[in-house]
Amino acid sequence: MIPSRISHKFPLFLRSSLAAPKAAYRFSSTIPKPSDQVPDVDAFLNKIGRNCNELKDTFENNWNNLFQWDSKILKEKGVNIQQRKYILKQVHNYRNNRPIHEIKLGKKSFFGGERKRKAFTAKWKAENKQ
């Protein structure tokens, strides 16, 4: 037997679980219109750089594909993880009216990362003294 205090909440639980999935409505109203600077998918991919313009055939030059596809779909299309994350970040920025521009890849230091830099520098100097 179901206690009386839970029984009045049970139909609400059923009603919410049987509702249409939220994923279907996820990006329906958040697809921005193309601007003068970014009129189509090809221009968007050229503007963000990092050789993303090679993927214009993947998006089929369709503005809706660019803003509706998630990481799972891009993975199925064969886009590598670094470009997927980068494109989705730039799409998110454009959707939120933030400026989009190319973010250059970082360059590794000759002496390694920040944590071990002192050790590598000391080792390199010791080798060069001899």
UniProtKB/Swiss-Prot annotation:
Keywords: Mitochondrion, Ribonucleoprotein, Ribosomal protein, Transit peptide. Residues 1-27 form a transit peptide. It is found in: Mitochondrion. Its main location: mitochondrion. The keyword Transit peptide applies. It comes from the Eukaryota. InterPro entries: Ribosomal_mS41, SAM_Ribosomal_mS41. Signal peptide: none annotated. GO terms for cellular component: mitochondrial inner membrane; mitochondrial small ribosomal subunit; mitochondrion. GO terms for biological process: mitochondrial translation. It holds the Pfam family SAM_Ribosomal_mS41. GO terms for molecular function: structural constituent of ribosome. Present with 2630 molecules/cell in log phase SD medium. Component of the mitochondrial ribosome (mitoribosome), a dedicated translation machinery responsible for the synthesis of mitochondrial genome-encoded proteins, including at least some of the essential transmembrane subunits of the mitochondrial respiratory chain. The mitoribosomes are attached to the mitochondrial inner membrane and translation products are cotranslationally integrated into the membrane. mS41 is involved in telomere length regulation and required for survival upon exposure to K1 killer toxin. Belongs to the mitochondrion-specific ribosomal protein mS41 family. Component of the mitochondrial small ribosomal subunit (mt-SSU). Mature yeast 74S mitochondrial ribosomes consist of a small (37S) and a large (54S) subunit. The 37S small subunit contains a 15S ribosomal RNA (15S mt-rRNA) and 34 different proteins. The 54S large subunit contains a 21S rRNA (21S mt-rRNA) and 46 different proteins. This is Small ribosomal subunit protein mS41.
